[in-house]
Structure formats: structure tokens, C-alpha cells
Amino acid sequence: MGGNVGLSKAYNKAVESIDGRDGYICFFDDDTAVPENYFALMEKEIEKTGADILLPCVFDRNGYMSPCKISGVSVSAISSLEELNEDNISGINSGMAVKAEVFKAYRYDENYFLDFIDHKFLSDMKKQKRKIAAAKSVELKQSFSANDFSDIKAARRRFAVFKKDYSLFCRQAGGLKNKLIGALVIAKRFININFIGRLRSK
């Protein structure tokens, strides 16, 4: 594709290269540990739920990373799958299984480079009345670098990408409340990197 053009463009290129629109397409990050029985378990979850989109249970060192809850532009972790419903469910792309037919008339928003591509996608799918479900029996482990501030310079570069993508997500969501929440989230992450992260590294 010629250099790092962004994850959304890479996803679209991959989707376009797949022949046919039967079955499901599964997405994985390179920092996600995938168990050998992933596909067998996911197939059972598809049969059980009949969902268009299935989100496995992805864990990082703090607990559930995905699925998660979303309210407007505010994303928060869950402690139990019982907290989820069809309105507030969201999650990350890694491990996600999507019915191939979904992409007959959908492409990822290429204005996003790396962050919030998944939340934007799931928001769009809710508008299309697609069924989204948690694949309760499928568990993955994730090493997520966005919250690692041990390398301040790398964290600042990562923050610049996050800020651009999340600001776009907030603008597209619209409304003063969402813009204010977005500004607070960005400010909090900036402080964590430039002040708290620096103190921890000393």
C-alpha cells in the first residue's frame, strides 16, 4: 500500500480483496494473543447468537478491555458483561467477527488513522440496526500500548494520533456536551503523559 497509510485504509483494502460475501471476517491486532480454539468457539457463538457482529472478551492487565460501554463519546470499561445492552455496547476491532455481507455497502471512515475506528464502526452499525453481541466464551489477551507512558517521547507521538482521531469522533457525534467531554478526555491524557508519566519515569 506504500507506507503507513493508516488502519482504516488497511481495513478497507483487506475487505475489498476478499472474494464473496459469505461467512464472517475476523480482525486481529498484532499485540493480541489468539487461542487455538478461537475459530471453533466463535463459530458456536455465531450459531447461538445469530449476531452480525461478535465481540470476544479481550482482557488487558486491568481487566475487561472489550467489550466496553459507550455513552455519547465517553468510553468506559466494564466489570461484568451484564452491564452491556444493545445501546451501550462497543469494543475494539481485535478479535471482532463481522458478517461479510455488512461490507457490501460499508467502508471504514478513512479520515481516522488509528484510534476510534472501531467505535465509529460500531456506532454506524447500530444506526443500521445490526445485531452486536458479546462472544462470551471467547477470551483473548491484549497488550495495549496507548496507556503505557514509560517512554515519554513515544507516548507523546501516540497521543498526537489519539487526539486527532478522538477529536474527529467527537465532532462527528455533534453537540456541545460531546465536545466538552472530548476536551476533558484529551486534557486528562495530556496531563497523564506530560506530568504524571514523567514523574513515574524518574
Regions found by a protein language model. Name each.
Residues 79-98:
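A recurrent flexible, glycine/aromatic-enriched loop bordering the glycosyltransferase active site
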Residues 22-33:
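Short beta-strand-to-loop acidic/aromatic patch adjacent to the donor-nucleotide binding site
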Residues 37-68:
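Conserved donor NDP-sugar-binding/catalytic core segment of glycosyltransferases
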Residues 91, 95-96, 102, 106, ...:
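A short, conserved alpha-helix in the catalytic core of glycosyltransferases
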Residues 2-19:
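Glycine-rich, basic loop-to-helix element that forms the pyrophosphate-binding segment
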Residues 11, 37-39, 117:
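Acidic donor-diphosphate engagement hotspot in glycosyltransferases and nucleotidyltransferases
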Residues 134-153, 165:
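Active-site donor/metal-binding and catalytic loop motifs
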Residues 153-202:
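Non-catalytic, C-terminal membrane-associated alpha-helical segments of glycosyltransferases
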